[in-house]
Amino acid sequence: MYVHLKNIKRFIAFLVCISLSICLLAMPDVRMASDLVYGDLNGDREVNAIDLSLMKEYLLGKISTFPGGQGKEAADVDLSGSIDAIDMSYLKQFLLGTIDGLPVGEPLEPIQIPSFGSLQPNAKLPDPFMFKTGSKKGTRITSKSQWTARRAEISALAQAFEFGVKPPKPQTVTGSFNNNSITVTCSQNGKSISFSCAIQYPTTGTAPYPAMIGVNMNTLNTSEILKLGVALITFPADQIGKEDNAGSRGQGKFFDLYGSSYDAGALITWAWGVDCLIDALEMTPAARIDPKKLGVTGGSRNGKGALAIGAFDERIALTVPQESGNGGASGWRTADAQKAAGEDVQTLSQIITENCWFAKSLNQFSGQTNKLPYDHHELMALCAPRGLLVIENPDFTWLGNLSCFNTSTAAHMAYEGLGVPDNMGYSSVGGHGHCQFPASQQPELTAYIQKFLLGQNSNTKVFRSDRNYTFDKAKWVDWTIPTF
């Protein structure tokens, strides 16, 4: 037998196992694939606290394999294709009886990216609940559990056609903490890069602290965030992927590791960098940050990055893009429509000439945004069911004020379909400078932080603008909100 009570840690695990035994007997739905028992990491054909302990050791890097002979497949309880903190969270929920069975999703079908030539124009905002590829192409998901597969498809399409493909976790990621800063070191194929993130700690609350990650900086009211007992982490995004202008493509520490010819826009390199930061936080308890309670925010171009980071990493509990403009919370189709109506708004055709935020693969959609098999309402939906608060300023037409409203409305419909409408908010208030964050929006931000980072009951139901915008549903959607 693998487990011997040789130390206190194993003894505690045993006691927890005993305490959960009644709960486990009441939960027989541990699904098997041939001889595979999902969640059974030590090969004893049971799922218990010992398996939870093994999962923790694996995520902390203390072990690289599981002793049960089932490999890592049994640990991938959300069927996402990777083992991460989400799997550990589901395993905990199963042991506590808050979910009925494992795995929590359906096996993911390999996603075949369609060719540009095969894409069919669609002037409306695509249905976030309809599969676009594979054997289920043209069919809608019929249960919440299928969102895992649909989410993976949206993510793959967005990376292939817009952002660039985010590489998997580097071969080695380490973290070290000193002088209120965590240094992250990533190694791949004999190359290494490092970057440091400053941490500002609150004077209230208890360690390990929840934290808001600021992309390059934090343009919200940081003093109010600290008062809530939430730490602030500054992520040096421009070090990872430069974006001074279009000529910055291929520059930054990401490209030092993967090569300057890697077709990635700056935003996806930032998402990769925050992935590595979270990996480092998970293995560096000296940093006194709770890696399960992380938010991300950024203003303007950094807001585009914040949305991409939250969309592509499910470990982010709360995403707050602020006045992010087109390529952020403003969609490509809706921006084109606003431009066609005579307003001076940034569009896809313009943005690809301004900077290197996106991969070169996006260029082929210039003048043909209707061929995109997704749009940014679906990018926002990738955050579901996690928290998303869209902070906007209607005074800046260039940022796609109406476009953002339309895109956010469609994204909220996706949240409604998934049964969590209050997990996404939209707040658009003018009368101030770009990314100045007026005091009138602070209660909304506070509510979202309280709910998603502090675990408190807060009213997060907000969808408002101080402009009289209306959503032309007949123009933008030809799909309905599902009921699961």
What residue ranges belong to the model's regions?
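Primarily recognizes the serine-hydrolase "nucleophile elbow" in alpha/beta-hydrolase
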Residues: 277-339, 368
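Cell-envelope and extracellular/periplasmic
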Residues: 282, 323-327, 355-356, 384, ...
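Loop/turn elements at helix/coil->beta-strand transitions in domains of secreted/extracellular proteins
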Residues: 207-212, 228-232, 290-293, 314-318, ...
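Cellulosome-associated attachment modules in secreted, modular CAZymes
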Residues: 2-108
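Cap/lid segment of the alpha/beta-hydrolase catalytic domain
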Residues: 214-285, 325-334
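Alpha/beta-hydrolase-fold serine-hydrolase catalytic core, especially in secreted/extracellular enzymes
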Residues: 108-196, 201-207, 384-388, 393-484
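Extended catalytic-interface subdomain
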Residues: 269, 297-299, 321, 359-361, ...
